[in-house]
Curated annotation (Swiss-Prot):
<feature type="transmembrane region" description="Helical">
    <location>
        <begin position="145"/>
        <end position="165"/>
    </location>
</feature>
<keyword id="KW-0597">Phosphoprotein</keyword>
<feature type="modified residue" description="Phosphoserine">
    <location>
        <position position="110"/>
    </location>
</feature>
<keyword id="KW-0677">Repeat</keyword>
<feature type="transmembrane region" description="Helical">
    <location>
        <begin position="232"/>
        <end position="252"/>
    </location>
</feature>
<dbReference type="InterPro" id="IPR052241">
    <property type="entry name" value="SLC66/Scramblase_ANY1"/>
</dbReference>
<keyword id="KW-0472">Membrane</keyword>
<keyword id="KW-1133">Transmembrane helix</keyword>
<dbReference type="GO" id="GO:0016020">
    <property type="term" value="C:membrane"/>
</dbReference>
<feature type="transmembrane region" description="Helical">
    <location>
        <begin position="72"/>
        <end position="92"/>
    </location>
</feature>
<feature type="domain" description="PQ-loop 2">
    <location>
        <begin position="178"/>
        <end position="233"/>
    </location>
</feature>
<dbReference type="Pfam" id="PF04193">
    <property type="entry name" value="PQ-loop"/>
</dbReference>
<feature type="domain" description="PQ-loop 1">
    <location>
        <begin position="14"/>
        <end position="80"/>
    </location>
</feature>
<feature type="transmembrane region" description="Helical">
    <location>
        <begin position="168"/>
        <end position="188"/>
    </location>
</feature>
<keyword id="KW-0812">Transmembrane</keyword>
<dbReference type="InterPro" id="IPR006603">
    <property type="entry name" value="PQ-loop_rpt"/>
</dbReference>
<feature type="transmembrane region" description="Helical">
    <location>
        <begin position="49"/>
        <end position="69"/>
    </location>
</feature>
Length: 271
């Protein structure tokens, strides 16, 4: 009798746990970027954050949404992609504003045009939409250029997906590319740390959140029977996170000696 009396609690409790897990999947991925965003705004310095992290996440989540049209997966994963895209656009907007404000003699770099002379001297000439300098790709001076690039990529990828949606091979390949790209999330930051032989400007708190979040996400994929691509993605991300944590430990105990003439920028701990 007592077991039967408690039975009515079990189903609601199970549903509650499912809702909490789904909510954590949707919004948990953006939590690590909150300290990064706040620190960049506080210090007005974005040097410690690689905007290529935003590029990786934008591409990965756009591809994941397109993959959903060919092979439906759980709704929380779809909403997670939408929330992440909006978050990365906010990060790009802040980083662009801060970088431009900190550059005294800035040359305009845009998605639709190559470098021009200083804007104070003359207005840059109109150029074809895709006539951009590859050396300055993803280092533009206007947030609108990033938006144009994202929209162009979404349009092209969406059109190709529309034409090939009936091909199972294409759909599975699309899913693999989405998760493989996302698995490379930490690589731009890892490479930046390696080149500078330092993790200054990178928030250890954020990387720890990355690691815990990716571990939870991978477990969620495995327990809920998500497509194999998602589980592979999660495992690769956890490994990259651990390497970045190793960098933080190594560079903290064996810091690079600064050059005599070097001037360190203000710290921007926030990845």
């Amino acid at each position: 009798m007592e077991a039967e009396g408690l039975g009515w609690l079990l189903v609601p409790l199970h549903q509650l746990v499912s809702w909490v897990a789904a909510g954590a999947m949707v919004f948990g991925g953006v939590v690590p970027y909150i300290p990064q965003y706040r620190d960049i705004r506080r210090t007005q310095n974005a040097d410690g954050f690689s905007t290529h992290v935003c590029l990786v996440l934008l591409v990965a989540n756009i591809l994941r949404i397109l993959f959903w049209f060919g092979r439906h997966f759980e709704s929380p994963l779809l909403w997670q992609s939408i929330v992440m895209i909006l978050t990365m656009l906010l990060m790009l907007k802040l980083c662009t504003e801060v970088r431009v404000a900190n550059e005294l003699n800035i040359k305009r770099r845009s998605f639709a045009a190559t470098d021009s002379k200083d804007e104070e001297l003359r207005v840059p000439p109109r150029r074809p939409y895709l006539d951009f300098d590859p050396h300055h790709f993803w280092h533009w001076s206007s947030f609108s250029d990033y938006v144009q690039c994202v929209l162009a990529f979404t349009g092209v990828a969406g059109y190709i997906t529309y034409l090939s949606i009936d091909s199972a091979l294409f759909v599975e390949t699309l899913g693999f590319l989405a998760v493989l790209t996302e698995a490379m999330l930490g690589v731009p930051q890892l490479y930046r740390n390696y080149c500078h032989r330092s993790t200054e400007g990178m928030s250890l708190k954020m990387v720890l959140m990355w690691t815990s979040g990716d571990t939870f996400k991978t477990a969620y994929f495995l327990l809920n029977g998500a497509p194999l691509q998602f589980s592979v993605c999660g495992l690769l991300q956890v490994m990259v996170d651990l390497v970045i944590l190793g960098q933080a430990y190594a560079f903290a105990h064996h810091p690079q000696k600064p050059a005599a003439h070097a001037v360190h920028p203000a710290s921007t701990k926030a990845l």
